[in-house]
Amino acid sequence: MSLKETVSNPYSKWLEATGPENDVIISSRVRLARNLMGYPFPHVLGHENADKVLYAVQSAVAQKSLQEAVGNLELSRMTELSSIERQILVEKHLISPDMLEQPEKRGVVLRDDEVISIMVNEEDHLRIQCLLPGLQLKECWDLANTVDDGLEQIIDYAFAKEQGYLTSCPTNIGTGLRASVMLHLPALVMTRQINAVLTTLSKLGLTVRGLYGEGTQATGNLFQVSNQVTLGLTEEEIIDNLITVALQLVTQERAARRALHKEQLHQIEDKVWRAYGLLKYARTMTSNETMTLLSDMRLGVDLGVITGIPPGIIMELIILSRPAFLSKVKGADLNPYQRDIFRATLIRERLNSLSNE
């Protein structure tokens, strides 16, 4: 898939609703922060040096040995994309919101299936990311590590024997690894257990964020849980610790769902079918309303209240209904009211198409 196809297609591998524990865990991500020796960190990187870093990365990912190990990788400069197309990459979780600033200094490397992405000149020179559906942290780590090893054979990393990999943010020094899982936790929210859960996670040294990471709220009952510190821990320890916590959250969420199904079945059915009805027939719909209703419908699908709707379609609708993607599909900039109308139209069409498939 070319970059232009990537920003025109709501599909992404991590949206498939496959993989272990996929009824609760939407996706797993491993990200490695790396910097090139001999260059300032990106926040003080001039345009000339930024170009040199981009060129070095472009040359490295084109090497036959790396391509044979992990598949076809291609670097694109952010200036090759419109502002809307850059925002779509954020909406698909392929780049961070910070990448929208100073596009002339930045680039992104993508594999065709979007499982691998590398942000160039974001907070660090390289942010190697692997993103897979369900609970697949070990698989993400193995793939990200393969990319990292391949690049390290070509590029000199900034590394110190005592500290490990040197990074722009002190919390990333050491392994430079940030692992995270995205979870759908509607039952813990509905049973008002979520605050206690979040408090426990914080005490365990984990960070909880919303759908789009730092600074975002947990809309649609979607929560990102990640490690905070990398220094003093091995990569395997970080991954294993997060897997243990993720499985505990899966157990708690499923228990809460069973309790709701047993004790409040009529209320749950009403909530789910109301959400489905609004999504299928409403003529305007805000972004936040869409996220709430899609969460309710996904819960209904997972509980067996609604049948015939693949969970992956619900995840696809989350991306399809985001502001930049709406403008891309429409082929024009839309004001908020126009977006609400077009969002409702696209959702209706997609849900109605399921009955014809």
UniProtKB/Swiss-Prot annotation:
This is Protein-arginine kinase. ATP binds at residues 27-31, 93, 127, 178-182, 209-214. It catalyses: L-arginyl-[protein] + ATP = N(omega)-phospho-L-arginyl-[protein] + ADP + H(+). It comes from the Bacteria. One of its GO terms (biological process) is phosphocreatine biosynthetic process. The gene is mcsB. Pfam families: ATP-gua_Ptrans. PANTHER family: ARGININE KINASE 1-RELATED (PTHR11547:SF38), ARGININE OR CREATINE KINASE (PTHR11547). HAMAP family: Prot_Arg_kinase. Its EC number is 2.7.14.1. It comes from Desulforamulus reducens (strain ATCC BAA-1160 / DSM 100696 / MI-1). Appears to be allosterically activated by the binding of pArg-containing polypeptides to the pArg-binding pocket localized in the C-terminal domain of McsB. Keywords: Allosteric enzyme, ATP-binding, Kinase, Nucleotide-binding, Transferase. One of its GO terms (cellular component) is extracellular space.
